[in-house]
Amino acid sequence: DITILSGDDSLTLPLASVGGKGVISVVANIVPADVKAMTDLILEGDLVKARQWHRKLFALSKNMLTLATNPIPIKAAMAMLDMCSDELRLPMTPLEPAKKTALKQTLTDYGLLS
């Protein structure tokens, strides 16, 4: 037997629907309760409600993680949410100003910033 975990937030629900057993999540760093809510619904077999969470989390993941190589966007998001410092070590570099603005908008759209 082999256990399959999703390593891509956008594939958590699709993978779980074909037998995947969990997720190594990036967005759970900033919205752990939301990822847990979705995975709990998956485990309960309520794929209709899980799909609602998936769509919301998918937008967050897609809009955030396409800005730069991971973990730069999640680290920047966590810094914006006062969860950590914005200090990076090479080879990571800060987000460009336009991408930082896009990230702030993504976090605002999700309801994490006002």
Feature roles, as predicted:
Residues 2-3, 65:
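Residue-level marker of alpha-helix boundaries and capping positions
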